[in-house]
UniProtKB/Swiss-Prot annotation:
Tissue: Oocyte.
Residues annotated as binding GTP: 14-21, 91-95, 153-156
InterPro entries on file: EFTu-like_2 (IPR004161), G_TR_CS (IPR031157), GTP-eEF1A_C (IPR054696), P-loop_NTPase (IPR027417), T_Tr_GTP-bd_dom (IPR000795), TRAFAC_GTPase_members (IPR050100), Transl_B-barrel_sf (IPR009000), Transl_elong_EF1A/Init_IF2_C (IPR009001)
GO biological process: translation; translational elongation
Protein name: Elongation factor 1-alpha, oocyte form
Subcellular localization, as worded in the UniProt entry: Cytoplasm
Taxonomic lineage from the root: Eukaryota, Metazoa, Chordata, Craniata, Vertebrata
One GO cellular component term noted in the UniProt record for this chain: cytoplasm
Alphabetized UniProt keyword annotations: Cytoplasm, Elongation factor, GTP-binding, Methylation, Nucleotide-binding, Phosphoprotein, Protein biosynthesis
Region feature G5, mapped onto this chain: 194-196
Key word Cytoplasm present: yes
Source organism of the structure: Xenopus laevis (African clawed frog)
Record-listed N,N,N-trimethylglycine modification sites: G2
Function recorded in the entry: This protein promotes the GTP-dependent binding of aminoacyl-tRNA to the A-site of ribosomes during protein biosynthesis.
Length: 461
């Protein structure tokens, strides 16, 4: 076995018909966690339904359908391997809640793979004013996904097939576009592929002898290659934030007979250890952690990315709930936010948003109505430069700095200190109407909260 490979998370983005599913399905299929039996079953079903030409996407559709129905499918199905990494696809758009998931997402993507269709007229549709290509790429950048790979797909259906001219034309236009958003095209590999036929996916295509490979330049080291798989292998692995203070948003709180209260959640930053004195915000409850478990095994420490359950002393299920955040009581403990300032981008709101608007915010695991108390300034969404002070209203496409006040106690952090607790989705009318990143938090000094005896005792040590 040797040393285990590093885990990397990617998000696959692009317009509806760009071939994301087929491309992703192909990778999972060829390098992934799907066993032969499942694949044969899928192929048979696809053929029976006359969808033989659709088999890679079919793999993904089956997985998606199961995800949508809430069946926890074996997450290994969304994984595949490169020479250096285990890669998990943390979300595939087309999924209704894609934007919300990308923000509150179970995890931050280390890299976005943008698939654009090279077919006649297809590329133009995707990148047009209302195409999703732009929105997805802008979202990825706004939410801190700083690495990007571009697959120019469906090279088999260009005019003529596998056209060098078409690839170069698309590369030029997409480069200009991503540059406007904030990416540096010199660091982005552009790979001409066919997700269906497999050209330049895992091995170099014989159909494009003109393609001499992609090259990228970056301060962490230059890289070059030919295939999409090689480009994925050149992702720079993330620095996991173990050195920051602990932040663990609660997903659920269970009461387990004979054990007691067990909060469950994902460590976003820092380290959680048995014996630690943790404070929950905004409940303002402090107690000792008795034990920490993952997959029914006791841990000596839980690190960022770990989904854990931990047992806390003398606290009832009524004291803490989903959306609370646990942190180290002695190291920048989490606190309730009285109000916060955020930079928001309005994605799709049919009308005008003015001060007083109070939609629901999804931030980490919290789901709470917040009021747009004050619209401070409208800004240019690319450069962040101020366009006007105190705008009367905001509409789709606008970016602004706003002051927000939670309707109920809530714990959030600035994006620069704790990224996963500093980005949010604004939900209204069953869709994501805006996204935001938090620039500043006005923390509320809560009155003295509940401190359990064991915590008080351990605190004196």
């Amino acid at each position: 076995m040797g040393k285990e490979k590093i885990h990397i998370n990617i998000v696959v983005i692009g317009h509806v018909d760009s071939g994301k599913s087929t491309t992703t399905g192909h990778l999972i299929y060829k390098c992934g966690g799907i066993d032969k039996r499942t694949i044969e079953k899928f192929e048979k079903e696809a053929a029976e339904m006359g969808k033989g030409s659709f088999k890679y996407a079919w793999v993904l559709d089956k997985l998606k359908a199961e995800r949508e129905r809430g069946i926890t499918i074996d997450i290994s199905l969304w994984k595949f391997e490169t020479g250096k990494y285990y890669i998990t696809i943390i979300d595939a758009p087309g999924h209704r809640d894609f934007i919300k998931n990308m923000i509150t997402g179970t995890s931050q993507a280390d890299c976005a793979v943008l698939i654009v269709a090279g077919g006649v007229g297809e590329f133009e549709a995707g990148i047009s004013k209302n195409g999703q290509t732009r929105e997805h790429a802008l979202l990825a950048f706004t939410l801190g996904v700083k690495q990007l790979i571009i697959g120019v797909n469906k090279m088999d259906s260009t005019e003529p097939p596998f056209s060098q001219k078409r690839f170069e034309e698309i590369t030029k236009e997409v480069s200009a576009y991503i540059k406007k958003i904030g990416y540096n095209p010199a660091t982005v590999p552009f790979v001409p592929i066919s997700g269906w036929h497999g050209d330049n996916m895992l091995e170099a295509s014989t159909n494009m002898p003109w393609f001499k490979g992609w090259k990228i330049e970056r301060k962490e080291g230059n890289a070059s290659g030919i295939t999409l798989l090689e480009a994925l292998d050149c992702i720079i692995p993330p620095q996991r934030p173990t050195n920051k203070p602990l932040r663990l948003p609660l997903q659920d709180v269970y009461k387990i007979g004979g054990i007691g209260t067990v909060p469950v959640g994902r460590v976003e930053t820092g380290v959680l250890k048995p014996g630690m004195i943790v404070t929950f915000a905004p409940s303002n409850v402090t107690t000792e952690v008795k034990s920490v478990e993952m997959h029914h095994e006791a841990l000596v420490e839980a690190l960022p990315g770990d989904n854990v359950g931990f047992n806390v002393k003398n606290i009832s299920v009524k004291d803490i709930r989903r959306g609370n955040v646990a942190g180290d009581s002695k190291n920048d403990p989490p606190m309730q936010a009285g109000s916060f300032t955020a930079q928001v981008i309005i994605l799709n709101h049919p009308g005008q948003i003015s001060a007083g608007y109070a939609p629901v915010l999804d931030c980490h695991t919290a789901h709470i109505a917040c009021k747009f108390a004050e619209l401070k300034q409208k800004i240019d969404r690319r450069s962040g430069k101020k366009l006007e002070d105190d705008p009367k209203f905001l509409k789709s496409g606008d970016a602004a700095i706003v002051e927000m006040i939670p309707g109920k106690p809530m714990c959030v952090e600035t994006f620069s200190d704790y990224p996963p607790l500093g980005r949010f989705a604004v939900r209204d009318m069953r869709q994501t109407v805006a996204v935001g990143v938090i620039k500043g938090v006005d923390k509320k000094l809560a009155s003295s909260g509940k401190v359990t005896k064991s915590a008080a005792k351990a605190g004196k040590k």
